[in-house]
């Protein structure tokens, strides 16, 4: 894309990066991954094949995406070949924010304007306009009537 800013030490392999996106140092983005316009991908982040990141998304430092529920082992214990590999897609919708050190498992959609807390492990879909955190990540707050509301049963954070 146009006006993309890339740090000096990065690994990009057949991916697509939208206009005005910033990619930090020591980031790897694999083939068939897409990062939208006006995104920021912070240092030490791994974006694997099959990940789509829409526009205006923030990715914190050291975020890891996965793309296979059973990586590199077949049912008989052998290493998979490229032909055995089954890429499971992940989608991060526009305006989402993922905190540093989060791990996003495969087959997950992170909704529009959702926020994933630092260090979270996202194992299932994150609804739009929610804040999730923890291992596994769970909903802490939702955006309703223009302000963040504590989710039922949530004990974290201020009121």
Write out the residue ranges for each language-model feature.
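C-terminal/domain-terminus segments
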Residues: 109-125, 129-131
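Conserved switch/coupling elements of ABC/ABC-like ATPase nucleotide-binding domains
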Residues: 121, 136-139
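Intrinsic disorder/low-complexity segments
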Residues: 154-159
């Amino acid at each position: 894309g146009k006006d993309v800013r890339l740090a000096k030490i990065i690994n990009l392999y057949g991916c697509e990066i939208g206009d005005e996106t910033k990619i930090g140092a020591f980031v790897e983005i694999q083939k068939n991954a897409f990062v939208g316009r006006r995104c920021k991908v912070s240092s030490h982040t791994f974006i694997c094949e099959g990940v789509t990141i829409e526009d205006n998304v923030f990715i914190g430092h050291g975020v890891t995406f996965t793309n296979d529920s059973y990586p590199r082992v077949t049912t008989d214990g052998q290493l998979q070949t490229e032909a055995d590999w089954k890429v499971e897609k992940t989608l991060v919708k526009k305006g989402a924010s993922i905190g540093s050190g989060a791990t996003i498992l495969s087959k997950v959609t992170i909704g529009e304007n959702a926020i994933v807390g630092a260090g979270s492990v996202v194992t299932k879909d994150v609804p739009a306009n929610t804040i999730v955190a923890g291992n596994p990540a769970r909903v802490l707050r939702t955006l309703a009537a223009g302000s963040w509301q504590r989710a039922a049963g949530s004990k974290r954070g201020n009121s």
